[in-house]
């Protein structure tokens, strides 16, 4: 309708007269909901000629005691000049914290983004999944750390039998597809 077109024109005109710094000072970021962002890694290696997936057993809630892929929350800061870590930095950090595998010791590539509402019972969480390959000679260096109660290199059948926390079975399925 004409009234809406006039309002849009007025808004566009207002933004044109502001400098970017004025716009950013007046920007109301609280107007938009903020989902949490996590990174999860589907980590693979070959042990005794069998494809294995690095799994952790969760130390705490939610899904305490369940199998999960290594991962965790992106460190975000509320400072426009220092907004926190990048996704890939978070993936390397989480992999090192939960498995003790040193940064740069494995191939890591972004796989897919998972954002289905309800995928995490704590809050709205969007997860950026990564595909990782660990050379077999380094696989034995992996040790549970951080919020992992234990760690294991399992074959796909073992994982299917035990099930996984969150939507990690879906992430794993995407990684092997």
Model-predicted segments: where are they?
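Low-complexity, highly charged intrinsically disordered N-terminal segments
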Residues: 2-6
């Amino acid at each position: 309708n004409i009234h809406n077109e006039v309002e849009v024109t007025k808004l566009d005109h207002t933004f044109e007269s502001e400098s970017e710094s004025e716009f950013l000072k007046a920007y109301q970021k609280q107007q938009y909901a903020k989902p949490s962002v996590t990174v999860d890694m589907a980590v693979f290696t070959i042990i005794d000629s069998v494809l294995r997936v690095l799994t952790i057993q969760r130390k705490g809630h939610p899904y305490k005691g369940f199998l999960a892929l290594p991962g965790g929350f992106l460190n975000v800061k509320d400072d426009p000049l220092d907004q926190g870590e990048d996704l890939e930095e978070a993936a390397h950090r989480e992999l090192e914290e939960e498995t003790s595998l040193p940064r740069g010791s494995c191939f890591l590539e972004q796989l897919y983004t998972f954002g289905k509402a309800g995928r995490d019972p704590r809050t709205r969480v969007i997860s950026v999944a990564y595909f990782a390959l660990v050379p077999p000679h380094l696989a034995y260096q992996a040790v549970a750390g951080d919020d992992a109660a234990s760690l294991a290199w399992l074959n796909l059948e073992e994982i299917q039998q035990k099930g996984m926390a969150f939507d990690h079975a879906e992430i794993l399925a995407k990684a092997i597809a």
